Regions:
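N-terminal Rossmann-like FAD-binding beta1-loop-alpha1 element of flavoenzymes
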Residues: 126-152
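S-adenosyl-L-methionine
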Residues: 61-93
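Helical element adjacent to the flavin cofactor pocket in flavoenzyme catalytic cores
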Residues: 259-286
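SAM cofactor-binding core of SAM-dependent methyltransferases
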Residues: 4-66
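Extreme N-terminal leader/targeting segments of oxidoreductases
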Residues: 94-97, 103-126
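Dinucleotide-binding Rossmann-like beta1-alpha1 core, especially the glycine-rich loop
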Residues: 169-251
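Conserved Rossmann-like nucleotide-cofactor binding loop
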Residues: 61, 135, 158
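Glycine-rich FAD pyrophosphate-binding loop
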Residues: 145-165
Length: 286
C-alpha cells in the first residue's frame, strides 16, 4: 500500500506546479501509488499542471515487452512513462530532474542519476516548430499541452503538404533480431500513436473507423525468410498482444505467413494533422 504521507506530499507538489510536475517512482508494482495520486479527494479539481509520472516496473503483472511504455491520461491531465525491466538498464532514459519521488528509500540506488529539484518553472515560453506534418503538429500539440506558445512554420502554403498529405498510412511496431534501439523506439511510438488517436477521438476531432482504426496488421514474409523470422520472434518472446506468427492462410487467403500485429492499424495522415492543430487551441500560431 502506498504511504498516505508520501501521496499527499507528491500531490501537493503537483497542485502547486505551474507547468509540468515530474515524479519518479522506482517501484511501480501494480500501480497503487500512481492510482492513489490520481484518485483526488472529493471536491478537489484536476490540477492545471501536467503530471509526468516516470516509473520502473521489473515484473509487470500483465505481459509487456521490455523497454519504455507510454500512457496518456488527458482526463487526469497526466502521463505515465513506464520502464519495464531492471531500472539500472534504463538510466540513460530515466536520468533527469524530478519535482518529487515516490518510495524515497528505494530511489536511493538511482540518486547518482536523478536530481530531486523542481524542474523548469511554467512561465510562458515561446517555441518555433518547423514543419506542419504529422511530426511537427504532434510536437506542437505536446508543447501546447504544457502551456507553451508555439509558432508553426512550413514551406508549403498549408499543413500536411508533403508525405503527411497521403490518403492513408499504416502503423505497427518494428521487429528486428536483437531488439535494436530502433525497434524499442518504434514500440514506444506505436503505443503513443494509438493513444494520441484515441485522445483526439474522445475530443471529437477524429472518428475511429473513418479517420483511423486498429483492425490488425499482417506483415507477410517471403518463404526463404520465414524460418529466420520465426526464430527471431521466439528469441524475443514478445507477448501475443504485441506480435505473433501467422501461418499461411491463417488470417488471409495467402500462401505467405508473416508477423501479425493485432493492434496494427491505419490512419488518414492529413486528418490527423488537422486534429492535432485544432487541439492546440489558442497557444498555436501558424
Amino acid at each position: 500500500m502506498p504511504c498516505p504521507e508520501t501521496v499527499h506530499a507528491v500531490r501537493s507538489a503537483w497542485l502547486t506546479s505551474a507547468g509540468v510536475c515530474t515524479v519518479f517512482d522506482p517501484e511501480f508494482g501494480s500501480g497503487e501509488s500512481f492510482n492513489a495520486l490520481l484518485n483526488l479527494p472529493d471536491g478537489m479539481p484536476t490540477p492545471k499542471a501536467l503530471l509526468r509520472y516516470v516509473a520502473v516496473c521489473e515484473h509487470p503483472q500483465t505481459p509487456l515487452a521490455p523497454g519504455l511504455h507510454f500512457l496518456n491520461l488527458p482526463q487526469h491531465n497526466a502521463e505515465l512513462h513506464l520502464y519495464v525491466g531492471a531500472g539500472k538498464s534504463a538510466l540513460a532514459e530515466l536520468q533527469g530532474k524530478y519535482d518529487a519521488v515516490m518510495e524515497p528509500d528505494a530511489a536511493r540506488q538511482y540518486s547518482r542519476w536523478l536530481k530531486r529539484e523542481p524542474s523548469a518553472s511554467g512561465k510562458l515560453r515561446s517555441v518555433a516548430v518547423l514543419g506542419a506534418g504529422i511530426a511537427g503538429s504532434s510536437v506542437a500539440l505536446a508543447l501546447c499541452r504544457q502551456g507553451i506558445q508555439v509558432h508553426l512554420f512550413d514551406q508549403a502554403a498549408g499543413p500536411a503538404a508533403g508525405a503527411s498529405g497521403n490518403w492513408v498510412g499504416a502503423f505497427h511496431p518494428h521487429i528486428t533480431r536483437g531488439d535494436s534501439p530502433l525497434s524499442r523506439l518504434s514500440r514506444l511510438g506505436f503505443e503513443h500513436t494509438v493513444q494520441a488517436l484515441e485522445a483526439l477521438s474522445r475530443q471529437g476531432l477524429l472518428e475511429k473507423g473513418v479517420d483511423w482504426d486498429t483492425p490488425g496488421h499482417l506483415q507477410t514474409v517471403p518463404p526463404e525468410e520465414a524460418m529466420r523470422t520465426r526464430e527471431t520472434l521466439q528469441q524475443l518472446d514478445f507477448p501475443p498482444e504485441l506480435v505473433s506468427w501467422a501461418e499461411p492462410g491463417e488470417l488471409l487467403p495467402t500462401h505467405l505467413g508473416g508477423l501479425y500485429f493485432p493492434k496494427g492499424g491505419w490512419v488518414k495522415p492529413a486528418r490527423w494533422v488537422q486534429a492535432n492543430l485544432h487541439a492546440c487551441g489558442e497557444l498555436l500560431n501558424t
